[in-house]
Amino acid sequence: MKLITEKKMIKYLDLTTRALKKVKIEKNLSKKDLKRAKIYLEMSKNYLSDAKHFKKEGNWVNAFAAVNYSHAWLDAGAISNLFDVDRDNIMFTVDSD
């Protein structure tokens, strides 16, 4: 399939929105890691905002790219142990144990 369908767009916007709500910055991080965690979180929020803007403008290719970048920042934070995602390996690329 070579199309970004409305169903797929809604699915990924919803998934990333829910994932963003679930993320918590890990406790007891070093100053450096806390700064990094906040940057990752801000980048994710910014890309999600961009995705919604692009979708509203009818630019679905950039919207789909932006929502995937948004989620990638969340995954990066989870994999790096900057974010507590409650070992959710459905919404995030992490081990469940």
Task: Explain the meaning of each model-derived region.
Residues 1-97:
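Long, charged/polar, soluble alpha-helical segments
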